[in-house]
Design a protein with these regions (language model features):
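Short, solvent-exposed secondary-structure boundary motifs
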Residues: 1-8, 31-37, 80
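Phosphate/ribose-recognition catalytic cores of enzymes acting on nucleotide-derived substrates
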Residues: 10-13, 44, 69
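N-terminal intrinsically disordered, cationic/polar leader segments
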Residues: 19, 25, 31, 91-92
Length: 92
């Protein structure tokens, strides 16, 4: 399964249903060398070239259920709907 958010396509997707955390990464998570947090509180990971390679979304399903989408600033605000992350949150 892949999930595309903005201009990044994440091919390493894991949803931890027990804690409602969605982990997204491009390839191997160990390529991340720099870390930041979006204004919404999502963890952002970047490679040595400054390219976004990972996003961790806490309360992913809760946000979709409550807001209908997940807002992520990367640096532009991207709105991610259930059509994008729904399969991952359903464990498909």
């Amino acid at each position: 399964m892949t999930i595309t958010i903005g201009s990044s396509t994440f091919d390493n997707v894991f949803y931890d249903v027990d804690v409602d955390v969605l982990y997204l990464h491009v390839g191997d998570p160990s390529t991340a060398v720099d870390f930041d947090e979006s204004p919404e509180g999502h963890a952002l990971r970047f490679d040595a070239g400054g390219r976004l390679v990972g996003v961790t979304i806490v309360n992913a399903k809760s946000l979709i259920d409550r807001e209908g989408e997940i807002a992520i600033t990367l640096p532009e605000v991207v709105h991610v709907g259930s059509d994008t992350v729904g399969p991952a949150l359903a464990g498909v």
